UniProtKB/Swiss-Prot annotation:
Binds 1 Mg(2+) ion per subunit. Residues 174-199 are annotated as: Disordered. Pathway: Metabolic intermediate biosynthesis; chorismate biosynthesis; chorismate from D-erythrose 4-phosphate and phosphoenolpyruvate: step 5/7. The gene is aroK. This is Shikimate kinase. InterPro entries: P-loop_NTPase, Shikimate/glucono_kinase, Shikimate_kinase/TSH1, Shikimate_kinase_CS.
Amino acid sequence: MAPKAVLVGLPGAGKSTIGRRLSKALGVSLLDTDAAIEKQTGRSIADIFAIDGEEEFRRIEEGVVRAALVEHDGVVSLGGGAVTSPGVCAALAGHIVIYLEINAEEAMRRACGSTVRPLLAGPDRAEKFQDLMARRVPLYRRVATIRVDTNCHNLGAVVRYIMARLQAQLATPVSGGDRKSSEAERSGAPLRKSSEVVK
């Protein structure tokens, strides 16, 4: 058993919203790993960060992600920082991983007003967000098999594009390390160097 798709991206990229729409379009369920962590621990993510620290949160998160990749056959939406765990990145190998790309200005507009993102809490949120981008974007690109620009506000177009890419991938199944190469060849783009753009 494996997910139909795994969504990754920065806070504000639309993982939850697009995940719900994509899972509905595919006729499957959505598993949000942040929600799964809160259900498993009986605590909020903010509480885990505040009391136990980020390292403990990432340990819990890795376990939840690994279980989801084995047990869930729908769509899986990962927390924005999940890819900072080497174990998570390793576990994503061989899965269809969709990186929801977003520019800094739009991401900050969507995310920095949130009160439920522990790493963006307090003052200097814009600076903190820029730091998150610098550390995480290379990791998203590394694990992604499909990259989608979500800066446009037409979520329907984003979901339709993802559906088309998933259908193309299912029509030409590839395994493990060959998948990223196959994706790049079909898009006509250099491997991991260009974005799949939705207008």
